[in-house]
Amino acid sequence: MPFACLAEASHCCTVALPGGEKAVLRRFFQRPKRSMAALLTRQRMDCKGDGRFLYASRPFQILRFEIRPEVLFAAQWSDQSQGLEIAFEDCWIHGLGAMQNAIRFECTALLVPKEECVEAQARAMVLLSSDSPLTALPTGLRQRLAAQALQLVFVRLERRCQGGLKRALLDWIAEDAMGRADLNRES
């Protein structure tokens, strides 16, 4: 069954990390499991090995639907893009009844360590099956609902970057600084 794009959007944010050296931040992101544990709720994440993870998102409301996304994604360090690449491999959107197989969600993200910050970029799409009963709804309404869903996703991503990821990175920076201070005392 062919799918058509209802909405596509991207979002960028910068996580300020005073004292964060690029090399130190890079070491953090070179271990995808550590990075994903900082970004996502650990109790909802299942590590599948080889940089693949299954994540059951917290439910959210759109209209009368309680939507519960579940995502299988891969995360890996890329020397070419100098960052952690995250790509959805599969996504299940529970809570839409018979319509849940008619909707697809795709997302890619890149977390790039810089001097004293991390730049996060995400691109996402909502797609609808051409034989879905939802095609009977006006196009404008379908597109607005899909755009609203993407904005909710980006709000969550921003909050996770500025919250858990930032805390984990600041702890990582502090641990690295203490380790270097201990080495200097021993010299």
Model regions: which residues?
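Solvent-exposed residues in well-ordered beta-strands and their adjoining turns
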Residues: 14-18, 58-60, 76-78, 112-114, ...
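Hydrophobic-ligand binding "helix-grip"
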Residues: 66-117
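A conserved amphipathic terminal alpha-helix motif
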Residues: 138-183
